[in-house]
Amino acid sequence: MDRWLIWDWNGTLLDDVGAAVAALNRMLVRRGAQPISVAHYRRRFGFPVRPFYAELGVDLAKWDWDEICEDFHSFILEEPQAVRASARPALERAAAAGFRQCVLSALRQDKLEDGLASAGFLGFFAHVFGVDNLDGASKLQRGRELMARLGELEAPPILIGDTLHDAEVARDLGADCILVGCGHQLPERLAAAGWPLAADLIEAVELAAAASAKRGM
């Protein structure tokens, strides 16, 4: 019987919070807004990103949205970012526990595949589902397409992510969810979602294995 883990990429397997804030601040300053701290970012960041950018002082009526997104993604490529040290051990542990694994991300498909290939992670995943845009839209739709690809399941897959949006996506898809508190949103924000909260990726896999065992799988 297949048991599936659905991994988020940015902020979950990839430790890119610092890079995201640095790129965001460059984009903000270019448009006359004030830079923010990592702590402020983790307190306020959310999906969709348009309201978040407006909250930070970006005049969305003045600035072209596609240019905003292109600036951010251009800037973030210039910032240091790396997969979490626990990412490979967590993926290996999940595979050893009998899980099949896939990725669902709000990152554009080509950038997602490039990132996974660079990390040497593609071999862990049966499916890799990113989006077709730069503003993080349509992750939910891609999740629905992924669920269709997985077919009829005897137990819901478990989505591991780092944002309240991941929790929302999981609920819509009928998946279970485990949130990790080391990513783009603070743990106290994630706790409000009502899903199990892990401190790191290893604990997330352990929670997933325990949940699967309770189902007798």
Please report, for each region that a protein language model flagged, where it lies by residue.
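Acidic, Mg2+-coordinating phosphoryl-transfer loop and its flanking beta/alpha structural elements
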Residues: 158-197
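Short, acidic loop-to-helix structural element flanking the phosphoryl-transfer center
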Residues: 76-103, 110-113, 140
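Conserved Lys-Pro-Asp/Glu-containing loop-to-beta segment of HAD-superfamily phosphomonoesterases
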Residues: 4, 139-168
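Active-site neighborhood of HAD-like aspartate-dependent phosphohydrolases
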Residues: 1-43, 55
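Conserved phosphate-coupling serine/threonine residues in phosphotransfer and NTP-handling enzymes
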Residues: 12, 105-107
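A metal-dependent, Asp-based hydrolase signature
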Residues: 30, 43-75, 85-96
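A short, structured active-site edge motif that brings together acidic residues
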Residues: 40, 122-137
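Conserved H-loop
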Residues: 34, 122-126, 153
